[in-house]
Amino acid sequence: MTRRFVTWGIPALLALSGGALVAQQSDEALFMTGAEPVSPEDYAKLPKQGRFRAYLPKQVDLSNAYPPPGSQGPQPNCVAWATTYAARTFLNFRDKNVQPDEPSEQMSPAYVYNRLRPAGTPCTGTISIVQALTLLKNEGTVSLAEFPDDMTKCAVPAAEGLKEKAGNFRLLDWRAVDREVKDDWRTPIILDDVKGALARGAPVIFAMPAPADFKAFRGDGVYRRAEKPDKANYHAMAIVGYDEDRQALRIMNSWGPIWGDKGYAWVDYATFKLLTGEAYSLEAPIASVAPGAPPPPPRSDAQVFADQVAAMPCGAVSVQGKSVTGFSGDLNAIAALREAATKADPAMTVAVRHMPWPQCEAALTLAAPLARAGTSLVTLTADGKDRGGDPVMMQENDIFGVSATTSAARPYLSIIYLQADGSAVELHRGHPEPDRKGVRRVTIGLSQTAQRYQVAPPFGPEMIIALSSAKPLFGDDEVVNGTERQFLTRLRAKLVSQQDDALSAAYVRLQTTR
């Protein structure tokens, strides 16, 4: 497919020909915004996306199914570019292996912007994301080839028949992302819910103020800001991925490739939470297969097996000769891998353990610390003997204890319990002193007068994690307790901030029953 030629208009051409200094001097005039923010009261009433409580990969990048970053030019129609050109086009191509780079493949932001502008109004009016999403759900849109973007005109009526064609590209649904304290506009958008939507392949649109330093941003670095700007217009953009190692979201703008990193940018998680006023996830109807479309090319049994290994959800699989080992959080994926291995080579042996989420994500996140010596963890019977097994089997009313050891190199110890009710509870945080033999050990849960642990409902798979660090992993006032999703996200952020060898870990898996 050929690349779409983007018309930039006079200001952008001058910036391109005049070099970086001219671009920097004219950023304010060159980069238009145009998002009409929704009021906190109205945002609270919008339908909300459900809380995400599942596996999050370390990285997600959906940009290959998005069109190339375009330019909204001098019109304040960023909302249409984000919702329609970016997100609605993506929904047409997320299951394909080509990038939509032709006008006939790209959804028209001009159609949406013009449909929402009253006839005869000037090209200075803004629209809200909710208005655009409502139009896309009720009416749809058409391609850029059918309704080209003319930056000199607005409130242009659609040609006869286009509205009927637009119905082919409706949204199935959209949902607002809730805030950390439900419907409290003073608290941030829930970042894990944004990442969760991206992880399941849903596009996310958001709006934030676009201050001067954001307009001047260039390169592959991470945009950061410590405080809200005093005054800046709201700007809508698409989120195309995230990277836990960078602790940043990947966004696609509508200011052309001369901005940011060829039209994209990384935005720091904390900055996103500080600035973002609203965010939405989108979904489209399942596209029907075009009549006469050729079937996908056949794959060999070896290719199918290799693909199953590479795509193992919430897991890690290793193939050594004819031995396949590892773990995954998905029983169906393990069964499919076993079947594919048998077809590829009947002599293969598959020993892939099932570790349901959140256990599988904890094991993936802590892969490097788990490989380092210095931390041990066991569960104990009521009389202090080691409980064996993987997982350790325990029944209702069983008394149990937890014993962990650490080392002089990493003397700070935290013990976290991921429980069957979906919560993460910090059982211990401290700095154990060495005993007479030099062993730094903590034993908890078996006291007759203080903490005493007893198995109680709800029952199911659980996990206890010991984390040993050279310096305190969590701050004195930092609360670790929360959901397992919140803990795993916090843990990833902590690992990014630690030196490579500063952390060691161990875990014990539990299975509690009635």
Where are these regions (language model features)?
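Bacterial N-terminal signal peptides that target proteins for export
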Residues: 1-10
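Bacterial N-terminal signal peptides
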Residues: 9-17
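Structured alpha-helical subdomains that flank or immediately precede key functional sites
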Residues: 24-76, 80-98, 124-144
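Predominantly the structural core of cysteine protease catalytic domains
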Residues: 56, 84, 88, 116-252, ...
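Second-shell loop/turn segments in exported
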Residues: 64-77, 115-125, 180-184, 193, ...
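Stable alpha-helical elements in mature extracytoplasmic
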Residues: 74-75, 79-87, 108, 112, ...
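Active-site-surrounding "flap" and adjacent substrate/cofactor-binding loops of secreted or lumenal enzymes
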Residues: 86-119
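Secretory-pathway glycoprotein ectodomains that are cysteine- and/or Ser/Thr/Pro-rich
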Residues: 293-514
